[in-house]
Amino acid sequence: MARGKNHPDGEEEEAPAAAGEEEAPVEMDEEGEMEEEEEEEQGEGEGEERDEGEEEEEWEDAEEVEGGEESEQAAAEEEDSPLVVVEAEAAAPVVDGSPPKLAEGYYEIEDIRRRRLRKGKLQYLVKWRGWPESANTWEPLENLSACSDIIDAFEMRLQSPRPGRKRKRKITTTPVAGSNPSHGKRGRPRLDAKSHTRAPAPEPKQLPCRTSCRRATNCSSKTVAGLDASGSVVRNQLAQNIVQEGSSSVISRTPCQELPLSIRLTDQQNEHHLVNGSSNSENLVKVPPSQGGQVTGAKKRKSGNVRRFEQNKPTQGQGECGALVVAEDVGSTEGETGDKKKTEGCPNRVHITKIIKPVRFAAAVNNDVQQVSITFKALRSDGQEVMVDDKELKANNPLLLISYYEQCLRYNPTS
């Protein structure tokens, strides 16, 4: 029903309509706020997704950067590493007459000289083409992986025998004619069967007469005649022994007769020399060397007089081992040492055993040098007391004289 504008109902109806109109924008505002909140929430979700995506992108970029750095480092290490291989693929096209151009860091191998094992790794000494021998380097097997053919050839050369070495061994082992006998490992000469067969050394009692004995036997008549001509007295027993033996080449000897038979002087002869005041050295008789076809041994030194003195006076009935003054023409060292041992082994030989006391002394000046001679009273091995000069003791019993001097030493400390 249509109503006018002034109708109260109409007015009343219009009022609620206006109120409806007024409520509509409020509802619209609430819906807009809801939509804005939803949009904001969506924007925040998108922002978070964007942030997460950006973070993921940053992580990916960092990983890419790290991977790039690692690749760059690996490339740098590959460039800096001393890999020395020969690669035909890396070589540039070769012009005729010019050496091949290799990639950077690669060098051409001329030959392999030696091989060694260092710290458990196999290494080869490489000779580089175009470089001197002083530039050779030891390279591990890993650096020569592309040169297996050269390494195989080198190993084959090592395994194959060298003919030059065999020739050298043959030369060193071939004995030279007329050379010295071969030696053992320690340098000792190898003895032949002939050198091993040596005659066993006979016992001392079975030894034949030595050179001095043979000379005395052959020249016995000359020696006796010479002594008689010089006015010396020869022991009767010696003359009788020589006459009894005759021309025999071997003299039967008792232990006392093992002394050298060149010259034997009696006690009377010694006393005669002492009475006349002549020294023993002036009355020495030289025995001429044996002549004939007899062997006297090789001379190992110059001939000279070997003097054996014993100034002690033997008693009566001492037999043939009395005091001796011997001068022998030395022909060989063997005869000398043998006679010396025999002389020392004589059981009846008399010697000084003790110096009792000094008796007198005499001073003399010779060539402006004062010399003192001391006479001692000494005890002999046969129990007799004799007078002995210090010179005789020095010649025959030096140790006994030194021992006596040491016993007589006196020490007076100065205050």
Curated annotation (Swiss-Prot):
Main location: nucleus
Composition bias type Polar residues, residue spans: 172-182
A GO-annotated cellular component: nucleus
GO BP terms in the entry: heterochromatin formation
UniProt xrefs under Gene3D superfamilies: 2.40.50.40
Pfam (any one): Chromo
Annotated region (Disordered), positions in chain: 1-102, 158-209, 273-318
CDD domains the record matches: CD_CSD, CSD
SMART domains linked to this entry: CHROMO, ChSh
Start-end of Low complexity biased regions: 84-95
Domain spans labelled Chromo: 107-166, 348-412
Biased composition (Acidic residues): 10-81
Subcellular location: Nucleus
Claim: Nucleotidyltransferase is one of the keywords in the record: no
This protein's UniProt keywords: Chromatin regulator, Nucleus, Repeat, Repressor, Transcription, Transcription regulation
Superkingdom of this protein's organism: Eukaryota
Record text on subunit structure and interactions: Homodimer.
Free-text domain note: The chromo domain specifically binds to dimethylated H3 'Lys-9' while the chromo shadow domain is required for dimerization.
Reported function: Structural component of heterochromatin involved in gene repression. Recognizes and binds histone H3 tails methylated at 'Lys-9', leading to epigenetic repression.
PANTHER family on file: CHROMO DOMAIN-CONTAINING PROTEIN LHP1
Protein name as it appears in the record: Probable chromo domain-containing protein LHP1
